[in-house]
Amino acid sequence: ANHFLPGEGFRQDPEELVRISQSLLEGLLASICPEGVDSPESGESSGPQIGGIGISAQMHGILYVDQNGKAVSPFYTWKNEWGNESYQAGKTYAQYLSEQTGMDLYAGYGSVTHFYLQKKGLIPQDAAAFVNIGDYLAMVLTNTFEALADVTIAASFGGFDLKKRQFALSAMETAGVDISYYPAVTEGKAVGTYQGVPVFTAVGDNQASFLGAVKDRERSVSVNVGTGSQVSVFSGELYETGKGEVRPFP
């Protein structure tokens, strides 16, 4: 699933990612419930019940969907570096947005990629919104069309107000970003069902790894020496020191 499409931009095929993910899900459900899934709504108890389907997704990246929830672009991953290209007055796209908004925005962040594509005229004409790949998987599984992003994913796009837990749309619009494509922010929402089982909005992979790795989040430190190379701790309050990155927790 790490295969990139030919050419620059570290882009992936969203339909292939969904196909692989759905195949893995089918195999998992079959191994847990060989005689069929008993959903919470079914009222039956002939076998194991599945309380819900959770999704964890790599953060920052975006893809565009049309009004019917169909992908109309590749998935531009967090590795995309177009935001580091020169924009104006000797500044890159990312530097310009950071200066204009007063927020830290980097190449690979969804808001920066979106701004680059907007200025280059590369947003598909039939695009209605952008979402993360995990959001798109949830849409496909539940056959829903509303563009939603869990707060953990939404914040990773950049241009996000941590105190309000919403996009800083006014600041982004003032900086010249077309804000009409931003998804609605939600928290822990079941967007629909798959085989009768609730499917929840995707959670950021960093937060999901912390949630799954520690027993006591209040007294634990998670050290990831893999791809992320991250040290993560939990805080019940918004605690900004300027020495690390604060991310919403589910």
Q: Which sequence ranges carry the predicted segments?
A:
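Short glycine/serine/threonine-rich phosphate/pyrophosphate-binding segments
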Residues: 57, 111, 208-210
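Catalytic phosphate/nucleotide-handling subdomain of diverse soluble enzymes
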Residues: 204-250
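Acidic, glycine-rich active-site loops and adjacent beta-strand->loop/helix elements
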Residues: 2, 59, 81-82, 189-191, ...
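Glycine/Thr-rich phosphate-binding loops that ligate phosphate moieties of nucleotide
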Residues: 5, 51-95, 122, 235-250
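Short coil/turn connectors at secondary-structure junctions
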Residues: 60, 72-74, 125-128, 178-181, ...
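Gly/Ser/Thr-rich active-site cleft segment
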Residues: 97-206
